[in-house]
Amino acid sequence: VKVHTVEHILSALTGMGIDNAVIEMDANEPPIGDGSSAPYVELIKSAGIVELDVPRRYLEVREAVTIETKGGSILTILPSKQFRVSVTCVGPENRITQYFDAVITPETYEKELAPARTFTFYEDLKPLLEKGLIKGGSLENAVVIRGEELMSKEPMRFINEFARHKLSLIHISEPT
């Protein structure tokens, strides 16, 4: 069985500090909800969080590490006592440039990252549909950008919503 489009669930779990969970599904992808991780945060909170009697294991960053993807994205990890994340999101042809920076805790994740929605550019819709992707996508659960116009039903939730959404999908959690 293959399960697709799990990034919002994984983001919500790790953003809320959960590293051990069982999720049962009766379809090959979870519901899209409102296009953000926020509905999953609410489900996690309503189910409750139970701490295990097993200590967490972490990797300790002792020196700077930089990784660059084939697409040109750059990730730099620096040693720190806090879990601070900064992200700059630049769209095609520099159409959108946004920045977000925060010390991440479950509380800041819930308020500052989880509500940020999926977004795409209008010209990317046809290729995505032809690949059989975004089947549950609509203007109610995604921000669609056409030129300089937002086609979505709801206005932006944050002035830098795209940067926050990209950051939320890194599947973050605060080290303890």
Where are these regions (language model features)?
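C-terminal regulatory domains involved in ligand/effector binding and gene-expression control
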Residues: 1-19, 24-173
